[in-house]
Each structure stands twice: as C-alpha cells, then as structure tokens.
Amino acid sequence: MIAHHFGTDEIPRQCVTPGDYVLHEGRTYIASANNIKKRKLYIRNLTTKTFITDRMIKVFLGRDGLPVKAESW
C-alpha cells in the first residue's frame, strides 16, 4: 500500500503508463508495461507478476489529480 494518496479513479487501460500505482482485486500493483495491440496491461508487486485485460483500470491519485508514480526499485 502506498503511504499518501488522494483517492482513486478509473481510467482507460490505454492511458495507464509504466510506474502508475494500480488497484486490482483489492491489491496494490505497479504498472510495468502496456501492450495496446494485445490489449494487456502488465502489473507487478514484490511477489506477483500478472496482466489485466479490463477496459477500465483503477489507479491511485496524487494531490494534483494525476496517477501516483512509483519510485524506481
């Protein structure tokens, strides 16, 4: 879970960029790649790597209203 965020919002899968914090099935992930041709958003956390094919993705928002970016590992 991220420390500070200002709510969540659902945005189209194509608009998610690598590094965005994503909420999927109650767990927090980081978007790693967005393959628009295959219609897959690849996500990861410390223990899991998977992909999402949903059209709308829930992201955490920062104080500026934009998706929160992860720090590089």
From Swiss-Prot:
The keyword Cell division applies. It comes from the Bacteria. Keywords: Cell cycle, Cell division. GO terms for biological process: cell division; negative regulation of cell division; response to antibiotic. Signal peptide: none annotated. The keyword Cell cycle applies. This protein is encoded on Rac prophage. Causes inhibition of cell division. At high levels of expression, can also abolish the rod shape of the cells. Division inhibition by KilR can be relieved by overexpression of the cell division protein FtsZ. This is Killing protein KilR. It comes from Escherichia coli (strain K12).
